[in-house]
Swiss-Prot record:
This is Large ribosomal subunit protein bL27. The keyword Ribonucleoprotein applies. Residues 1-20 are annotated as: Disordered. PANTHER family: LARGE RIBOSOMAL SUBUNIT PROTEIN BL27M (PTHR15893:SF0), RIBOSOMAL PROTEIN L27 (PTHR15893). Belongs to the bacterial ribosomal protein bL27 family. One of its GO terms (molecular function) is structural constituent of ribosome. The lineage of its organism: Bacteria, Pseudomonadati, Dictyoglomota, Dictyoglomia, Dictyoglomales. InterPro entries: Ribosomal_bL27, Ribosomal_bL27_CS. GO terms for cellular component: cytosolic large ribosomal subunit. Signal peptide: none annotated. It comes from Dictyoglomus turgidum (strain DSM 6724 / Z-1310). HAMAP family: Ribosomal_bL27. Keywords: Ribonucleoprotein, Ribosomal protein. One of its GO terms (biological process) is translation.
Length: 84
């Protein structure tokens, strides 16, 4: 006969898959049109010049150029400065 009653099932043991968010191209880097610059949840960083925003708030380059971050009115922006 068992000396102890059976314990209840553990209520831990679950975890969500990683989402790989964050800045993908940093300031000064050369990018091509369509390159993903930032993956984020919500508008942590806003799109600036030559930058588009996807349905899931992903920021991507619209033109080739150099990545530049800036802060205006308390908001962070990412821009792509075209090289011509």
């Amino acid at each position: 006969m068992a000396h102890k009653k059976s314990g209840g099932a553990s209520r831990n043991g679950r975890d969500s898959n990683p989402k790989y968010l964050g800045v993908k191209r940093f300031e000064g880097q050369l990018v091509e049109a369509g390159n993903i610059l930032v993956r984020q949840r919500g508008t942590k960083i806003y799109p600036g010049m030559n930058v588009g925003m996807g349905r899931d708030f992903t920021l991507y380059a619209l033109q080739p150029g150099i990545v530049k971050f800036s802060i205006k009115h308390g908001k962070k922006y990412v821009n792509v400065l075209s090289i011509q």
